[in-house]
Amino acid sequence: MIEIGETMGDQPTNKIVFCERSWKAPVSILAFLILVTFAWGAYLLDNYDEDDYFRGSDDMSVGQFLVRNVAMPDVQRLYYTVPPAVVGVGGGGVNAGPVASGAIVGANGYVITTLHSVANVPDITVQVATSAGIRRFPAQVVKTIPGHNLALLKLQTTEKFLHFRMANIQTVVPGQQVFAFGRNMAGAPLVRQGMVQSSDAPLAVGTTQITHLLRSDAVYSWEQTGGPLVNAQGDLVGINIAATGPTGKVEGFTVPAQVIVSHLQDVVRFKTGGAAGVAPPAAQTVAMGSSSWWSKAKAVVGGPTAVPGMGMNVVQGTVTTGIPSGMPFVDTDHVGGAKIGGYSIADILGLGMLALAAGVTGGMMTMGGGVLQVAGMMVFFGYGMYLIRPVVFLTNVVVYGAAALRNDKAQLVQWDKVKPLIPWGVAGVVIGYFIGNAIGDSVVGVLLGLFALIMAGKAVLEILQPNAGEDTAEAIAAAEAGDEMDELMALAEGTTRPKTSGIALPEGPTRSAVLGLPMGLFSGILGISGGVIEVPLQRYIGRISLQNAIANSSVLVFWASVAGSVVAFIHGGSTGLIHWEAPVTLALVMIPGAYVGGILGARLMRVLPVRVLKGIYAATMAAIAIKMLTTV
């Protein structure tokens, strides 16, 4: 029996020595080649999705990129080059697909799309094709133009992007070859070649009648809505609107480039294309077999009908077709005229008048001017809160800084009471700024409308009080009992007295927080000055005279606005939401009007009857409330 572990007999000696064999060298070479193969594979896996074709294209327009290596681009290069500047616009859900297309018009990530597509989207996300594949960027509305169904978005990033330059209006002629781009539900690009058919075609979107539109048969699907219509040079002719006609088929409209530039050049510094080159022959447009996405995206003549709910109904009107072939379109409403810093004279006057009205309102009633300024910039000029906040903060720094200096010179500022409140006001505006950004412009608009409604109701109740506004000694005495209307009259006469009623809080951090924090929060969230909150707090909790309350509030608003400006520019700049030029320019336009309006309002307070002042204030706040609450 043999036990495990034992050996049986003598084993032969192994005389084969591996290292002495002749195949040592081939095996070593093979092992080396295997290592090289794995290293090369790792490199390919790490870099397989990068596309050298677009390398170095940051901060370039599509037209510039097309002619970088050739004198005149062919259509095949156009099909391949344009899609990176075409984006998909949708919601913020993980699996949410695009609700519209869009066009990048600024290297810093400015995107134009159709307003109706994003009006009810709470968290806007933009899908951008990059050399590393499709990337999703959060975006915010910077400005809207309801009259032309346009929305300007800003990607929340500091990266640079390939973008469109605007076509010269003199190069757009009837019969011109154009290409309508978009992105489908899967995010893949689609395009159709067509031509410019006519100009000034009417289109109704809801209750809004849009004019100055182009007609083009290149638009065949709702997925092209918001996407670019480009010419053979890669320049942006306009933004597409796909509308369902009476037969259910898609009819193509385009908001032309000159309209876009006219309304948005205050925010974006557009590049403009030069004279038109020779258009490539039509025969070149059919060969795209080398591009797989083009094979999938080719449109059938006539196109599919629009997806239900995604198109818009066309209001049938007379389409202009009498322009001779080869003649350029003429749009005197949007082309020409004096511009200052990208603003038309009409826009400068409008912004100045809004600032003047806000200043007068604040000067007459010592509050409410900021509400009017913010609401006016949202409703009449279409600006988003990301741009409004820094503008209002900068305006307040100048206006309330000057007011604080005047009040300090008149020895009305109670520094011993104000200094403990400043840190709370600064903290409040910082917190409020981020809360306002988080809840979005739509919610801010509702809150602003509700706030204005409350202020209007308060003013109406004061008007309805017995003996309101009577110029008598009893009216002055009534200020001590809390009659706000007569306090206003007493302020005009310089006879206000300390408040004897109200809420008594002991000195300390709690009292400072109650007096300083709410003003900062409201200022940061709504973008208003906060004086409308701080003056009553100073009166009823601080228990001081109306003159001292206004003086103390001017100091708090000044420091809160300084903090708000710093936060808005640092946060906005670091996230790519704003660039300093636009808010600074807007502030420079509005500051003179707000300053002069404040002085004029203070004089009107001394001239007009208090009941009239309260009536004007109530009507103004009511109008703001109605407009804000009915447009959301």
Swiss-Prot record:
**Gene from which this protein is expressed:** mamO
Region: TSUP-like; residue ranges are 365-632
Q: Specify whether Transport is a keyword of the entry.
A: yes
Q: Identify this protein by name.
A: Probable membrane transporter protein MamO
Query: Is NADP a UniProt keyword of this protein?
Result: no
Protein's organism: Magnetospirillum gryphiswaldense (strain DSM 6361 / JCM 21280 / NBRC 15271 / MSR-1)
Q: What is known of its domains?
A: The N-terminal region is an inactive protease, the C-terminal region may have transporter activity which could contribute to its function in proteolysis by MamE.
**Chain positions covered by the region annotation Protease-like:** 78-268
- Other known facts: This bacteria makes up to 60 cubo-octahedral magnetosomes of about 45 nm in diameter which contain membrane-bound crystals of magnetite (Fe(3)O(4)).
